[in-house]
């Protein structure tokens, strides 16, 4: 690639929008809204309020707020009428590469993978691009937090939870070490006509891959024990990074997409006293008893998918979260798609809700549960007093495809809900407003929530179809 092409690619990958300003101590009161707190066991609150101050939620309840801890609401508080609107915690995009890649066809913008099969010392947050042009698009879809997974190899590296606001990746990082991500080898051969190896050869490769896992984790445990006994020994960054995982203090995130993969991965992890989390989930229902026995959560990679096999029903992916929840398994929902589509996370949860998953459970699958699994539940994922003021106001039911996010806050800071696409929309709406060209070029401000979007009038001399 030429130097000119690299410069153009780098320029395209930069967002021109500024990060949100720091939170102020002025109170913000959202009134008369339907509030979905995502707190376990709590239904949606109708005609409810949320009071924010600084970077925290200070009060949540029903009715009209008059005082907080005996102190009246400040006279200068910003009051927002939420009539007909819904308030939810910010959505969390799980198992994503958002911020690690910009344009898939431009390798210079791709920082998803490292060379080699084993690199647990790699941390996703270090490679996150704070100027990514995909962040504003994701924020418009309600995604204010991303659980970023590195890719490549068998032990891919350390995942990180980041907020989609900040000048630097250090400012954006919430949980730098949120679990080590590994790719579990396939357990069932693929006897398809396009397979490049025979079933017997695939079995040999599987055994070889499992042996590599055993050897690597055995060496890591031995190195950690040796250095604990004698701190003067040289530090191996790869093995040292697994210390918390081997101690069961951080989760081991295992990519597995079949019943055989999930079963072997869980048994292997529990034999080593690790905390497995399954990433993928296809086939999980077949081994649900094992997952319940060992309390293993599942991150389902997308519901807007076709069945993998011809014998499966059309709604196999749609109903998977509901079937797992019914068996007592904790479920998070991810897009399972390229990061430019993370904006659609609510529709993945909505599909699960439409096919049997309780609505509040579906909301929790993209808010509370990812926060719990990534180690940030003390601040994010729910709306409650003392939690971070990281939340959304929706124009209507958040699971309706016609609903839009009308306001958002990250740690109490109001978020600019604009993207390159929305700016172009506004530009051409202004261009074609009115029945003649007299109003073109005006600087009319777009209303926050238009009553309706109508087709632009035909230009003079142009026949409408």
Kindly give the residue locations of the regions a language model identified.
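Extracellular/periplasmic ectodomains of large secreted or surface enzymes and adhesion receptors
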Residues: 14-15, 25, 326, 407-465
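Sec-dependent signal peptide recognition
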Residues: 1-10
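Divalent metal-coordination and catalytic microenvironments
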Residues: 33, 50, 55, 84, ...
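His/Asp/Glu-enriched, well-ordered alpha-helical/loop segment
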Residues: 109-113, 121-122, 251, 292, ...
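Polyanionic/metal-chelating signatures
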Residues: 134, 139-276, 404, 410, ...
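Acidic, glycine-enriched loop/beta-strand segments at the rims
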Residues: 17-22, 35-49, 61-62, 67-69, ...
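Active-site core of metal-dependent hydrolases
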Residues: 39, 124, 149, 227-317, ...
């Amino acid at each position: 690639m030429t130097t000119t092409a690299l410069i153009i690619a780098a320029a395209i990958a930069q967002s021109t929008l500024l990060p949100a300003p720091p939170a102020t101590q002025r109170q913000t009161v959202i009134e008369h809204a339907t509030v979905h707190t995502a707190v376990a066991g709590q239904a949606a609150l109708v005609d409810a309020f949320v009071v924010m101050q600084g970077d925290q939620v200070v009060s949540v309840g029903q009715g009209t707020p008059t005082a907080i801890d005996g102190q009246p609401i400040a006279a200068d508080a910003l009051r927002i009428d939420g009539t007909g609107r819904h308030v939810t915690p910010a959505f969390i995009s799980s198992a994503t590469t958002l911020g690690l890649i910009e344009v898939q066809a431009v390798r210079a913008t791709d920082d998803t993978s490292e060379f080699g099969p084993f690199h647990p010392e790699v941390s996703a947050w270090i490679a996150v691009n704070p100027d990514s042009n995909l962040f504003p698009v994701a924020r418009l879809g309600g995604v204010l937090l991303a659980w970023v997974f590195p890719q490549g190899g068998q032990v891919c590296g350390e995942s990180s939870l980041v907020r989609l606001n900040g000048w630097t990746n250090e400012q954006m990082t919430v949980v730098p070490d949120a679990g080590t991500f590994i790719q579990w080898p396939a357990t069932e051969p693929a006897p398809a006509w396009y397979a490049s190896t025979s079933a017997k050869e695939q079995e040999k490769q599987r055994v070889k891959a499992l042996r590599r896992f055993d050897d690597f984790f055995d060496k890591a445990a031995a190195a950690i024990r040796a250095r604990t006994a004698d701190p003067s020994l040289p530090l191996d960054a790869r093995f040292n990074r697994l210390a918390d995982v081997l101690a069961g203090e951080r989760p081991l995130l295992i990519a597995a997409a079949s019943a055989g993969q999930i079963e072997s991965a869980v048994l292997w992890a529990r034999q080593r006293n690790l905390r497995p989390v399954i990433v993928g989930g296809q086939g999980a229902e077949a081994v649900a008893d094992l997952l319940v026995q060992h309390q293993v959560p599942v991150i389902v990679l997308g519901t807007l998918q076709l069945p993998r096999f011809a014998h499966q029903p059309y709604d196999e992916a749609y109903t998977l979260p509901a079937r797992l929840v019914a068996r007592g398994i904790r479920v998070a929902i991810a897009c399972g798609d390229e990061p430019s589509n993370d904006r659609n996370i609510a529709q993945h949860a909505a599909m699960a809700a439409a096919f049997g998953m309780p609505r509040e459970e579906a909301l929790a699958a993209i808010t509370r549960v990812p926060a719990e699994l990534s180690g940030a539940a003390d601040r994010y994922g729910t709306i409650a007093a003392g939690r971070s003021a990281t939340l959304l106001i929706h124009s209507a039911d958040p699971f309706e495809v016609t609903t839009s996010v009308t306001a958002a806050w990250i740690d109490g800071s109001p978020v600019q809900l604009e993207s390159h696409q929305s700016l172009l929309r506004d530009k051409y709406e202004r261009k074609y407003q009115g029945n003649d060209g007299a109003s073109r070029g005006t600087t009319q401000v777009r209303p926050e929530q238009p009553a309706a979007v109508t087709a632009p009038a035909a230009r003079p001399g142009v026949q409408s179809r």
